[in-house]
Amino acid sequence: ILKAATPTSRPSGLRELLWQPEHLYPADVLSSMTNATTGARYEIDTTRNWSRRDFPDLAARVEAPVHFTVAEYERVWQSGPDDLAQIGALFTASPRFVTGEQTGTGHNLSLSYHATAYHLKVLSFVEECVAAQRTRTQSPATETSQKREAG
C-alpha cells in the first residue's frame, strides 16, 4: 500500500492500514487526519526506503535506550516475537532495547483513546532510564567519596 503513494495522491487502503479499527480513535481525529488528499512530499521518499534501508541505518546509530511499542492491531510493522527480536537486533549501539504492546490501539498509538496509557508507559520507561543512570553514578564508592569531601 505504502509503495503506491505519490506526491499527489494517497493510495487506496491507506486509511485501513493506519487507522483501524476505527472505533479506537476519536471521530475528530479520524476526520481531521484522514481527509487530506495528499501526504507531505517527504513521506513519499521516507516510506519508499524506510524498512529496508533508512530504519536499519538509523537504528544502528541510536545510542540511547529504546522502548519500541507496537499496537495490538498493528498493520504497518510485522510485530510477532521473531519480528520484534529482529528489530531489536538492529539497535546495536543501544544499551537497552525493550518491546511492548499497547492494547486497544491501531498503528497510530499517540492518537487513539489509549494515548494517555501509551504516553504514561513512555514516561515510565524514561524514569527507569534516569533511575538506572543515577544508580550507576551513585555507586557505594562514589557515595563514600562524596561523604568524605562533605565531612
Description of each model-found segment:
Residues S31-N35, F91-T99, S139:
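N-proximal short alpha-helices
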Residues D54-D57, S94, A117:
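Generic structural microfeature
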Residues P56-A59, I87-G88, L123:
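Short amphipathic alpha-helical segments and helix-helix/interface helices
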Residues A59, F91, V126-V130:
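Hydrophobic, Leu/Ile/Phe/Ala-enriched alpha-helical segments that form helix-helix packing faces
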Residues E72-T105:
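Conserved loop-alpha-helix segment in the C-terminal half of the alpha/beta-hydrolase fold
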Residues R96-G151:
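Catalytic active-site module of serine/aspartate enzymes centered on a nucleophile-bearing elbow/loop
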